[in-house]
């Protein structure tokens, strides 16, 4: 089966179980509230399982979006899932010209790895419009 990137609009019980493995520190109610607020949640699916996900807050009128909680399950890292998740998320929102991920979103012990990953995705480390440091494309 092929890896696909889906924009989730409703969470079924399987999605909730899988997102619990992606974001074990978060509660399903928070994901539902994120969606109900009109925000986007993209997930990488393989063999009917979610392997990674990212939340997106997009302001289409300004052509601007921020990425939140970008994560791939540890057991499936370094296999291209994250890169495909980012590339296809950007492709699915063509009205967005500026993409950002704040460094504060990433635990300090993972920043070096995330820096290499985000640069591989075409992002640069810089000062963001919010004034904090992070990656922008």
Model-derived segments and their meaning:
Residues 93-107:
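Conserved GNAT acetyl-CoA-binding A-motif
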Residues 20-47:
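Active-site rim helix/loop that mediates acceptor-substrate recognition in acyltransferases
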Residues 72, 78-91:
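Conserved acetyl-CoA-binding loop-helix of GNAT-fold acetyltransferases
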Residues 77, 112-113:
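Acidic/histidine-enriched, beta-strand-rich ligand/metal-binding domains
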Residues 102-106, 115, 119-137:
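Conserved catalytic-core motifs of GNAT/GCN5-like acyltransferases
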Residues 1-29, 129:
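Short amphipathic alpha-helix that is part of the acyltransferase structural core
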Residues 43, 49-58, 64-66, 71:
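Conserved beta-strand in the GNAT
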């Amino acid at each position: 089966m092929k890896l696909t990137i889906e924009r989730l609009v409703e969470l079924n019980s399987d999605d909730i179980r899988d997102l619990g493995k992606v974001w074990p520190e978060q509660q399903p109610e928070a994901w539902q509230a994120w969606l109900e607020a009109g925000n986007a949640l993209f997930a990488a699916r393989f063999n009917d399982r979610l392997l990674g996900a990212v939340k997106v807050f997009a302001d289409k009128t300004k052509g601007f979006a921020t990425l939140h909680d970008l994560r791939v399950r540890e057991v499936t890292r370094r296999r291209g899932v994250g890169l495909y998740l980012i590339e296809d998320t950007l492709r699915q929102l063509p009205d967005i010209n500026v993409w950002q991920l704040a460094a504060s979103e990433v635990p300090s012990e993972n920043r070096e790895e995330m820096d290499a990953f985000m640069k591989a995705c075409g992002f640069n480390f810089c000062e963001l419009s919010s004034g904090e440091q992070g990656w922008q494309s």
